[in-house]
């Protein structure tokens, strides 16, 4: 019979639908490529961070061994070994400023010590040492070691990102703010602070002032200098003990 076995015609796919499917497929490929590229970038960054950490560890160990060797050589020769002048200080505000002179108030602001038990790193030079002397009755300060710098940044470290105090929970936060200076991770940040590197100013300004706890066991005499049995002023390497009590 005529027309009885005619095949049913399949309706043609509209051009708009074909175009839509093509665009979707292209978009999917682009997304997959981007995802793969990001994955490879993260992998490369992780490897770089690991290599940097290893390099810094070696550098710190070498510095420590050099100090020990120089001290031994001096003793052997019957001399005293005088270490290099410290380049880094950690400063903690220990008193309020009611009734103080505007000069003291201004210096504390420049040091970013706006509250009691705030702490900041300071690069030591003639100008900064003079500033510390002006506010010495209101601060405790000294020379932090690598362990103290490491513990402060890892435990109490917050970054200034878009004028906000943001916890440093991810290396990506550091890379976004300081990547242009070659600082992409916590280890870079610690190294720059600890060695007072070329980008110390940028790294230090990125760090929000540390909010420390009241020291375990309390304080002795805030108004008396450390050398007289009090808490104020320069306590040199003994600042590390105070940091442990407050961190």
Curated annotation (Swiss-Prot):
From the UniProt record, list the sequence repeat ranges. 7-17, 18-29, 30-41, 42-53
A GO CC annotation given for this chain: cytosolic large ribosomal subunit
For this protein, the record's CDD domains field holds: Ribosomal_L7_archeal_euk
Which of the residues bear the PTM N6-acetyllysine? 123
Extract one GO molecular function annotation from the record. Answer: structural constituent of ribosome
User: Where does the record place the modification Phosphothreonine?
Assistant: 16
Q: What SUPFAM superfamilies does this protein's entry cite?
A: Ribosomal protein L30p/L7e (SSF55129)
Keywords, ordered alphabetically: Acetylation, Cytoplasm, Phosphoprotein, Repeat, Ribonucleoprotein, Ribosomal protein, RNA-binding
* Main location class: cytoplasm
| One biological process term in Gene Ontology | maturation of LSU-rRNA from tricistronic rRNA transcript (SSU-rRNA, 5.8S rRNA, LSU-rRNA)
**Which Gene3D superfamilies does this entry report, sorted A to Z?**
Ribosomal protein L30, ferredoxin-like fold domain
- Report residue spans for region: 4 X 12 AA tandem repeats: 7-53
Tell me which residues bear Phosphotyrosine: 138
Record's subunit section: Component of the large ribosomal subunit. Homodimer. Interacts with DHX33.
**Which family would the database say this protein is a member of?**
Belongs to the universal ribosomal protein uL30 family.
The protein in question is named Large ribosomal subunit protein uL30
Q: Which organism is it from?
A: Macaca fascicularis (Crab-eating macaque)
